[in-house]
Every structure is written in C-alpha cells, then in structure tokens.
Amino acid sequence: MTKRFKLEAVIIFVLLFISSSSAQSSSDVCYNPNLIKDTTKKSIKSATFAMIGKDSIKINYHSPGVRKRIIWGGLVPFDEVWVTGAHDATSLELPRSISINKTKITAGKYALFTIPGETEWIVIINKKWNQHLASEYDEKEDVVRVKVKPLQVNHIERLQYYIETSDQRSGKIAVVWEKLRIEVPFEY
C-alpha cells in the first residue's frame, strides 16, 4: 500500500506542476512564444516574411522596446531620418519586383527608413541596405518616398514589422510600436 501511495503522490505532484507551469499571468507573456520571457533591455534582432506567389518578401530589423520612455519626439526625434528599428538599417528583401506609390522597385535588397512627423510620416526605400543607423544615409540613393498618416493602436512594447498580402496581388508593409502603426501599400 505504501508503494501505491507514493506512486499516487508522485502523479499528483507531476500533474500539479504541469498545470501550474502552463498557466501564465499577463506579466509572463512572451514577445515570441519561442523565446523566454522578454526582460532584455537590448534591441532584439528580428525578422518577418510573407509569401508573394511562390516567393517570400523578408524584412530584417532590430526591435527596440518602449521601456517607459517617450518614443515619438523623444527617443525618436520628429523630422529626422530614422532606421525604423535599432542598430543597423532595416533591410527589405524582394524576390521579385513590387510597386509602391506607382514606383516600380526591382527584385533586390534595400534599406527601409522613415522620417517620423507629428501628423505625417515619410517612408523611404533606399538602395544602400548595408549601413549602421542612418549615419550613412544618402537621399540620392532613395528609390521611393511615400507619405503616410500614422494610425493610433493599443500599446505595443517592442517595435514589430508585418507584411500583409492578399490574393489581389497587393499587400501592406506595416510598422507598429508604442501606440502608432504606419502602413505602406504595395502591388506585385
């Protein structure tokens, strides 16, 4: 009888352990479910991609956190070129040509910059993708510039990119951080 009691006690302990470890409070939610809880103060290297036909469009970036800082007009100044991430310029890899604002962008790798404004942003696709921050940015290398209006959203702690596509041969590149979202429509 003691062996059976010990076995039942072990089973109950294991079940309790499993059920308590799978329950998450809101403070335990991960930025990426494949990573441990996000407690880092660093800008995490991140990527996003989406399929356009049989090919994938990809964005590589570093994802800074808000961390109780003033972002717009503070950490990220208004009316200045920004890498729209951290560290290296955000890169956009296109397996095929797309059009943004009726400007054809051929297949290749590009940098994605923005100029945040209080009511309007400028999104820039630039030929020189391999650069640190915006210190090497050269307007002469711009492929296209698009004016967009920022949208208000719920708080997002870490900067995130999204690529949304549709069956209509169109899509959007979106950047979300703090309480703002910008979207750039494209066609392929």
Describe each region flagged by the PLM.
Residues 1-27:
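Bacterial Sec-dependent N-terminal signal peptides
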Residues 6, 106-108, 113-116, 161-169:
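Short, surface-exposed loop and linker segments with low hydrophobicity and enrichment for Pro/Ser/Thr
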Residues 7, 72, 99-101:
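Alpha-helical interaction segments
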Residues 19, 119, 142:
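Residue-level signal for beta-strand positions within conserved beta-sheet cores that form or flank
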Residues 24-75, 80, 134-188:
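Primarily secretory-pathway and cell-envelope proteins
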Residues 81-131:
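Mid-length scaffold segments of soluble, non-membrane domains
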